[in-house]
Amino acid sequence: MIFIDTAEIIVYGGKGGDGAASFRREKFIEKGGPDGGDGGKGGDVYLVTDPALLTLYDFKYQKEFRAEDGEPGRSQKQFGKDGKDLFIRIPVGVIVADLETQTVVDMDKPGMKLLVARGGRGGKGNARMATATRRAPRFRELGHEGEMRRLRLELKLVAHVGLVGLPNAGKSSLISVISKAKPEIAPYPFTTRSPVLGIVKKAEQSFVVSDVPGLIEGAHEGKGLGLTFLRHVERTKVLAIVIDAAAIDGYEPMQAYETIIGELRAYNPNLLEKPRVLVLNKIDLLQPEHIDQLKVQFADKESHVVLTSAATGEGTNQLVDVLFELISPTLSTEEPTAEFMTMELPPLPEDFSIRREDEYWVVEGRWARYISRYDTTQPWDFQYVQREIRRKKLEEMLRQMGAKEGETVVIHDKAFEIL
């Protein structure tokens, strides 16, 4: 049984650390010169396939992921520490799509690693800004922002456990207790008309369980929901045969058990080769002596028998434990790969480009990003940026395009006013 599980997340590479603006000051050393160190690089963000994960459940509540920022540089030419990379674990078989560039990567092997957001470069300290004509720079570079990506993750889910039972055996109630599924529950046959998917989570592991439409006698001949139901069962890895132990549905427990086993055998004998557990449900409606009789009655029928009550929750934790035990051997044993890939962002324009956007003039490109490295709230940085703007003749180009005095120009992420 295959379902589609999806999630949308935002990932951020760590910001690079700011460079330091400092000067060497030691006794007996005159004009020690600039000694500000560079900032550390921001951490990268990777997606890594992990065969132990089966669903995208972990992304239901956490949508944003951010790698660690680089540390700022310090005096005495000390470089800041690089930020730690962030590794996000995903199930094998996830298709990763960049929502902006439409780049698609199929993560179909265990151990694959995909770089989805690079960390920003650390800013240069003033020790590295010195030149032959600028021997004592009082400014430094700010750290670069890390890349940001909006990603869509899509996983085709195979239901690992199929709940098999006659109508009104309590499958829907049971799946609502052991998972967060919300099936329609009512006291009449065939309440469930299509498969209901639930995700059962235990510690850091999870598996997918499906409550499929109720079985009736003659299903293998197409009666009731018949062949549709049995096709769903065929694709699961583990069967959980759910029986109404209180016989409210009119079938005595042993009669119900033999009916279900008979239908599975008639449709495909291989279904009985699957790992399975017998679930005797609704025990809250039984007297203790009746429960003991059921234990004896089914002791030699199945190696795994669990007595549960979806109404009170009794036995449901034991059921989850048994299902995990049965599922573990069926999980992928494929050898992990060391394959590494990078999801590239489109390159920035070589120098810079100018466009009008609402009330602003926007300057983009590599040069614009370069300008954003400087802290224009500091006088020395501001003077340097002004010199760069004049060198590029940006103001002249803006006026030629119709820019007027008093209008705002945004260079990457910094705003200036045309004078």
Curated annotation (Swiss-Prot):
Residues 1-158 form the Obg domain. Gene3D superfamilies: GTP-binding protein OBG, C-terminal domain (3.30.300.350), GTP1/OBG domain (2.70.210.12), P-loop containing nucleotide triphosphate hydrolases (3.40.50.300). It is an enzyme of class 3 (hydrolase). GTP binds at residues 165-172, 190-194, 211-214, 281-284, 309-311. Its EC number is 3.6.5.-. GO terms for biological process: ribosome biogenesis. Its main location: cytoplasm. The keyword Glycosyltransferase does not apply. It is found in: Cytoplasm. Keywords: Cytoplasm, GTP-binding, Hydrolase, Magnesium, Metal-binding, Nucleotide-binding. Residues 159-328 form the OBG-type G domain. Pfam families: DUF1967 (PF09269), GTP1_OBG (PF01018), MMR_HSR1 (PF01926). Mg(2+) binds at residues 172, 192. GO terms for cellular component: cytoplasm. Residues 344-419 form the OCT domain. SUPFAM superfamilies: Obg GTP-binding protein C-terminal domain, Obg GTP-binding protein N-terminal domain, P-loop containing nucleoside triphosphate hydrolases. Its cofactor is Mg(2+). PANTHER family: DEVELOPMENTALLY REGULATED GTP-BINDING PROTEIN-RELATED, MITOCHONDRIAL RIBOSOME-ASSOCIATED GTPASE 2. Monomer. An essential GTPase which binds GTP, GDP and possibly (p)ppGpp with moderate affinity, with high nucleotide exchange rates and a fairly low GTP hydrolysis rate. Plays a role in control of the cell cycle, stress response, ribosome biogenesis and in those bacteria that undergo differentiation, in morphogenesis control. NCBIfam families: Obg_CgtA, PRK12296.1, PRK12297.1, PRK12299.1, small_GTP. Belongs to the TRAFAC class OBG-HflX-like GTPase superfamily. OBG GTPase family. This is GTPase Obg. It comes from Coprothermobacter proteolyticus (strain ATCC 35245 / DSM 5265 / OCM 4 / BT).
